């Protein structure tokens, strides 16, 4: 088998918050195939062209490559996209994105933590830079760390400009945010335990109405309802990688 610093989000400490409902027994890869249309596929069977923004080819772009053009953060090797973020040098995690364009739909990604750096993690999800009132268009993400998986609605959570300013004001004054504000922010995410390894995994991340779901190896491991997931246009699919991750295959599907 073929083988933005992870953006500091100014979040409250991530407590483990279990979903109120057990994740449904369903096959979201089959849902995408049966109900949707595949609008993009990349198996990375080529060589990249240099280190700059469009070097990966096939429509991929990097928001961070130009910060350190002398350092290669994405390497195509034997059909694998090997991401090694120059986070310290760039002052930002490697941020790689591709056009998407759907309301409901999702992505299927084959990935691996190669074990080349400590604390390997992967953030992947959806962006709409045309959205007003949301920092950098950040909509919603799945985040895989060494010990947990997070689903998070940024559009109506901490990346909402009003919420972001309110939190920054508390930090500037060195005040603890009030309980109602913390409760609001915490309601915009769900965190479930997960133990990372160095094996290949098939990941499915979908948006269906106001729900986001993440599956690993054909099993839904996290689901969460929040109004931001229903944003009508997920224009970009993006990876944010603070260290090292290998990507073997990416498919983007549109259901509507």
Please annotate each region the language model reported:
Residues 215-220:
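Short strand-turn-strand beta-turns centered on an Asx-Gly dipeptide
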Residues 29-30, 93-100, 188-195, 236-237:
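Beta-strand-rich interaction surfaces with strong enrichment in secreted/lumenal proteins
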Residues 21-59:
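Extracellular carbohydrate-recognition regions
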Residues 68-91:
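Short carbohydrate-recognition loop motifs
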Residues 157-202:
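Short, aromatic/His-centered strand-loop micro-motif at the edge of beta-sheets
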Residues 44, 109, 199-208, 212-214:
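Short tryptophan-centered beta-strand motifs in secreted/extracellular beta-sheet-rich domains
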Residues 224-252:
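Flexible glycan-contacting loops in extracellular carbohydrate-active proteins
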Residues 83-172:
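Secretory/extracellular carbohydrate-interaction modules
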